[in-house]
Regions:
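Acidic/polar-rich alpha-helix caps and helix-coil junctions
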Residues: 1-215
Length: 215
């Protein structure tokens, strides 16, 4: 939905699933330690004139310490444990392996739904019962779940390469990367979808060697 809604929040950010709000800092979002809304258009105070601000109109929220506030005597930095492995990752990897061995295995949907249940969203067994046993549709569901659940955890780069789909529509790692119009000086114009960089991916890049220090 286009336009700016109540409280200065763009309508396109409303009624998203819970993981969106736990992962992304978007225009109109309020940092919980203050009542100040965050905006990224020119002159907003958080635009890209600052070296540490957004180039796309979004910032990462997932994994950020919600007790920090760069004002007054508040804590401005804190160490946090990094995520190497998560149970959700294992559930989805196992579901993917089962789907390649035996698509009719009931554990496939059950493991995907374990991740969705924790996220507080409807279960596939209830809203998409027709995909059960269909290898292609189950694979699609697993890939979508990995993209959302494991966002910003360093998995996507490797997922699209092991699936050999990094040059396919919907998974492309090359071409223009879009965000908001960071040159706009008001929220309405800022919400225009705008390319902010162009990346290159060619099929030969699937064959990049693994660095020795990674082995």
């Amino acid at each position: 939905e286009e336009g700016i809604g109540e409280y200065g929040i763009p309508n396109m950010y409303k009624n998203r699933e819970p993981r969106f709000y736990q992962a992304i800092t978007y225009s109109g979002k309020t940092w919980q330690k203050t009542t100040k809304q965050i905006y990224f258009y020119k002159g907003s105070g958080d635009d890209n004139s600052k070296a540490d601000m957004s180039y796309s109109g979004y910032l990462l929220y997932k994994g950020m310490n919600r007790d920090l506030l760069n004002q007054g005597s508040n804590a401005k930095s804190k160490y946090r444990a990094g995520m190497l492995f998560r149970l959700a990752d294992f559930y989805l990897l196992y579901a993917e392996a089962l789907n390649h061995v035996n698509p009719s295995d009931e554990r496939i949907i059950a493991h995907i739904d374990s991740v969705r249940y924790r996220a507080g969203i409807p279960l596939l067994k209830d809203i998409k019962p027709e995909i059960k046993g269909n290898q292609a549709l189950q694979e699609e569901a697993i890939r979508k779940e990995r993209r959302i659940e494991l966002f910003a955890e360093g998995q996507r780069y490797f997922d699209v390469r092991r699936w050999m789909c990094a040059d396919e529509e919907g998974y492309k790692q090359g071409g223009p990367v879009h965000g908001m119009n960071m040159n706009a000086d008001n929220l309405e114009d800022f919400m225009e979808r705008t390319a902010f960089e162009t990346r290159i991916f060619e099929r030969r890049m699937y064959l990049y060697p693994i660095p020795l220090n990674e082995i």
